[in-house]
């Protein structure tokens, strides 16, 4: 009889397309297609990123030029403000200079002229009064002296005779004692001369001439009247210098510096898109190749493993036949044969039986449950579910590599905003610093050139006023120093002129010490305010970077959704296999309940006998999976593959 089964070597010819290898090959194909899809999308997204990058650079350049554009507007405002303020200050200052000069000159002229007239009139009237009084006094004195001298002369003439007689006697007595002659007429002459001198006493008319001449010596202050010209001269000089000063020419916008526009090519220079996507594609391709190689190795390993498995299954089939033949005389031959076949058909039960000791009370239910969940149908569901989960995991690994790389790209794109803000902040700060420095130099020039001249003029006027006061005092003292008019005149001049001039001098001194201008400068927080407003309003750059990040997110989300669908499907398939466990446990519970009912004693009618089971036909053996030959009547060929089922 020819054999109708496959031997071991014939079975090996079909091992290479076993279900495990086929699943691994399908997983490899899935990974390959997934990788190609990602690489294709990366190529498309590379072009999109380059387009966005170009737009980002263009927009960033426009944004970075905002400080320069802003500085142009500010420069116009600063130049216009400085020019207007300088011209208005110049006009106001020249007006003030003219007013001050005119007031000082007017004040000096009006008081000096007024009080020269007052002094001249007062002194002239006083001199005239003194002259008239002196003339009357002189006339009266002269007449009195002449009258008195004549009366005295008459008395002296009589007295002279007596004295002369007496003197003659005295001379004689003296001559008697001294033997010298004495001339007594000497004394008479002296007496007569004294009377003549008294007669000649007369207040000269030159006194009247001196008093009259004193009136002509009243100071006219002609030298002091030149003070007006001296006071006016510094003001005229400063007016001329201000008109000729170059610092008061109009400031042009070109003289002010503009905020620099930094070159902004972050995306083009800092971000090498070609290199990024090339490296990313290499990473994806490398990871995919590794996964595919591993899967192919696993497929080859599955083939090799099944070769070994088939070998052991062939050996187990021979042992199974031997055990069946050994149990052919047992009463439970049918159940025992099926248990033996089940043990050898299930590798899991076979090795548990071989290496694990299980209580007999639980062995049947455990082996039955293992047989139920490891049938070819259940194992197919389990393998497909696990293979699906494993495939999803591998695809997630590839996707995670892309996600990690894109995070660095997104970080760089997001960092562009910070870099642009930093550049704009530096440019704006530098511009504000330079502009404030220029305004400070203009302020110094105005204080030095404009108010410096004012201070010079004030000092000169102060000096002139001091000279004026000194000359005025000198002039007055030269005339009235030793006269009764000295103190009143000095008091009058001080109260009317000197006091006012001292106040003017104090005012000019205050101007010298306090005259300065402080120009307003650009606020330092202008940069902070500008950058704060920019950060709130820079939707453009946000939109561009968000387009890239949203595109990346959309791409990754699409693949994630696809993988999640695969994950759900694989989990559902695996859940079906887990459901088999629940069904198996339910069937065990149901079978245990049925067995308990079957064990209940029933009333037996008649004498119990044990019947002989009816042998199965050939068709029934084939239907139930038993050997379709009778092992008791025919010789069994143990090389049949039927026992490997």
Swiss-Prot record:
<feature type="glycosylation site" description="N-linked (GlcNAc...) asparagine">
    <location>
        <position position="462"/>
    </location>
</feature>
<protein>
    <recommendedName>
        <fullName>Plasma membrane fusion protein PRM1</fullName>
    </recommendedName>
</protein>
<feature type="transmembrane region" description="Helical">
    <location>
        <begin position="22"/>
        <end position="42"/>
    </location>
</feature>
<feature type="topological domain" description="Cytoplasmic">
    <location>
        <begin position="311"/>
        <end position="378"/>
    </location>
</feature>
<feature type="glycosylation site" description="N-linked (GlcNAc...) asparagine">
    <location>
        <position position="514"/>
    </location>
</feature>
<keyword id="KW-1003">Cell membrane</keyword>
<feature type="topological domain" description="Cytoplasmic">
    <location>
        <begin position="590"/>
        <end position="645"/>
    </location>
</feature>
<feature type="glycosylation site" description="N-linked (GlcNAc...) asparagine">
    <location>
        <position position="473"/>
    </location>
</feature>
<feature type="transmembrane region" description="Helical">
    <location>
        <begin position="290"/>
        <end position="310"/>
    </location>
</feature>
<feature type="glycosylation site" description="N-linked (GlcNAc...) asparagine">
    <location>
        <position position="250"/>
    </location>
</feature>
<feature type="glycosylation site" description="N-linked (GlcNAc...) asparagine">
    <location>
        <position position="192"/>
    </location>
</feature>
<feature type="compositionally biased region" description="Basic and acidic residues">
    <location>
        <begin position="624"/>
        <end position="637"/>
    </location>
</feature>
<keyword id="KW-0325">Glycoprotein</keyword>
<feature type="topological domain" description="Extracellular">
    <location>
        <begin position="400"/>
        <end position="568"/>
    </location>
</feature>
<dbReference type="GO" id="GO:0032220">
    <property type="term" value="P:plasma membrane fusion involved in cytogamy"/>
</dbReference>
<feature type="glycosylation site" description="N-linked (GlcNAc...) asparagine">
    <location>
        <position position="525"/>
    </location>
</feature>
<feature type="topological domain" description="Cytoplasmic">
    <location>
        <begin position="43"/>
        <end position="102"/>
    </location>
</feature>
<feature type="glycosylation site" description="N-linked (GlcNAc...) asparagine">
    <location>
        <position position="547"/>
    </location>
</feature>
<feature type="glycosylation site" description="N-linked (GlcNAc...) asparagine">
    <location>
        <position position="533"/>
    </location>
</feature>
<feature type="region of interest" description="Disordered">
    <location>
        <begin position="624"/>
        <end position="645"/>
    </location>
</feature>
<feature type="glycosylation site" description="N-linked (GlcNAc...) asparagine">
    <location>
        <position position="226"/>
    </location>
</feature>
<feature type="transmembrane region" description="Helical">
    <location>
        <begin position="103"/>
        <end position="123"/>
    </location>
</feature>
<dbReference type="GO" id="GO:0005886">
    <property type="term" value="C:plasma membrane"/>
</dbReference>
<keyword id="KW-1133">Transmembrane helix</keyword>
<dbReference type="InterPro" id="IPR026777">
    <property type="entry name" value="PRM1"/>
</dbReference>
<feature type="glycosylation site" description="N-linked (GlcNAc...) asparagine">
    <location>
        <position position="142"/>
    </location>
</feature>
<feature type="transmembrane region" description="Helical">
    <location>
        <begin position="569"/>
        <end position="589"/>
    </location>
</feature>
<dbReference type="GO" id="GO:0043332">
    <property type="term" value="C:mating projection tip"/>
</dbReference>
<feature type="transmembrane region" description="Helical">
    <location>
        <begin position="379"/>
        <end position="399"/>
    </location>
</feature>
<comment type="function">
    <text>Involved in cell fusion during mating by stabilizing the plasma membrane fusion event.</text>
</comment>
<keyword id="KW-0184">Conjugation</keyword>
<feature type="topological domain" description="Extracellular">
    <location>
        <begin position="124"/>
        <end position="289"/>
    </location>
</feature>
<keyword id="KW-0472">Membrane</keyword>
<keyword id="KW-0812">Transmembrane</keyword>
<feature type="glycosylation site" description="N-linked (GlcNAc...) asparagine">
    <location>
        <position position="426"/>
    </location>
</feature>
<feature type="topological domain" description="Extracellular">
    <location>
        <begin position="1"/>
        <end position="21"/>
    </location>
</feature>
<comment type="similarity">
    <text>Belongs to the PRM1 family.</text>
</comment>
């Amino acid at each position: 009889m020819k054999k109708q089964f496959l031997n071991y070597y014939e079975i090996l010819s079909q091992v290479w397309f076993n279900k495990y290898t086929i699943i691994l090959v399908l997983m490899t194909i899935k990974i390959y297609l997934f990788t190609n899809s990602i690489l294709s999308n990366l190529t498309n997204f590379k072009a999109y990123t380059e387009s966005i990058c170009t737009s980002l650079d263009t927009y960033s350049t426009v944004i970075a030029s905002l400080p320069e554009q802003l500085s142009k507007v500010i420069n116009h405002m600063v130049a216009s403000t400085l020019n207007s303020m300088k011209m208005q200050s110049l006009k106001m200052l020249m007006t003030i200079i003219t007013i001050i000069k005119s007031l000082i000159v007017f004040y000096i002229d009006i008081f000096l002229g007024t009080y020269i007239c007052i002094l001249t009139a007062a002194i002239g009237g006083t001199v005239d009064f003194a002259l008239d009084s002196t003339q009357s006094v002189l006339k009266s004195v002269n007449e009195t002296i002449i009258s008195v001298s004549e009366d005295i002369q008459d008395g002296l003439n009589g007295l002279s005779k007596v004295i002369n007689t007496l003197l003659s006697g005295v001379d004689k007595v003296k001559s008697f004692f001294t033997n010298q002659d004495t001339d007594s007429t000497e004394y008479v002459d002296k007496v007569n001369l004294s009377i003549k001198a008294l007669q000649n006493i007369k207040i000269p008319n030159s006194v009247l001439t001196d008093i009259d001449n004193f009136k002509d010596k009243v100071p006219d202050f002609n030298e002091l009247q030149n003070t007006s010209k001296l006071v006016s001269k510094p003001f005229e000089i400063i007016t001329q210098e201000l008109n000729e000063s170059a610092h008061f020419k109009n400031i042009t916008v070109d003289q002010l510096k503009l905020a620099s526009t930094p070159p902004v090519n972050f995306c083009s220079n800092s971000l090498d898109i070609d290199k990024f996507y090339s490296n990313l594609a290499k990473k994806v391709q490398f990871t995919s190749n590794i996964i595919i190689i591993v899967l192919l190795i696993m497929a080859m390993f599955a083939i090799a493993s099944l070769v070994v498995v088939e070998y052991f299954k062939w050996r187990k089939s021979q042992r199974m036949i031997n055990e069946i033949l050994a149990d052919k005389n047992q009463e439970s031959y049918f159940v025992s044969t099926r248990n033996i076949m089940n043990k050898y058909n299930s590798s899991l039960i076979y090795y548990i039986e071989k290496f694990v000791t299980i209580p007999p009370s639980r062995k049947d239910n455990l082996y039955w449950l293992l047989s139920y969940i490891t049938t070819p149908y259940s194992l197919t569901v389990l393998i497909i579910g696990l293979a699906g989960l494993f495939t999803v995991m591998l695809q997630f690994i590839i996707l995670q590599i892309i996600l990690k790389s894109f995070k660095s790209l997104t970080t760089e794109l997001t960092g562009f905003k910070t870099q642009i803000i930093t550049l704009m902040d530096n440019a704006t700060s530098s511009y504000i610093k330079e502009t404030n420095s220029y305004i400070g130099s203009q302020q110094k020039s105005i204080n030095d050139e404009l108010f410096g001249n004012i201070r010079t003029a004030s000092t000169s006027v102060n000096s002139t006023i001091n000279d004026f006061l000194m000359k005025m005092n000198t002039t007055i003292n030269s005339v009235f120093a030793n006269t009764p008019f000295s103190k009143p005149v000095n008091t009058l001049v001080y109260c009317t002129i000197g006091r006012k001039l001292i106040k003017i001098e104090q005012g000019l001194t205050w101007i010298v010490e306090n005259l300065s201008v402080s120009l307003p400068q650009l606020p330092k927080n202008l940069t902070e305010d500008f950058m704060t407003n920019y950060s709130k309003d820079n939707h453009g750059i946000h939109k561009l970077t968000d387009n890239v990040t949203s595109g990346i997110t959309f791409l990754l989300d699409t693949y994630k959704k696809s993988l999640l669908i695969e994950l759900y499907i694989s989990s559902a398939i695996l859940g079906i296999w887990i459901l088999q466990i629940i069904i198996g446990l339910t069937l065990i519970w149901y079978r245990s309940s049925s067995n308990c009912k079957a064990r209940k004693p029933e009333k037996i009618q008649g004498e119990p006998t044990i019947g002989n089971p009816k042998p199965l036909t050939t068709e029934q053996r084939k239907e139930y999976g038993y050997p379709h030959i009778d092992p008791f009547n025919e010789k069994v060929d143990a090389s049949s593959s039927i026992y490997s089922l």
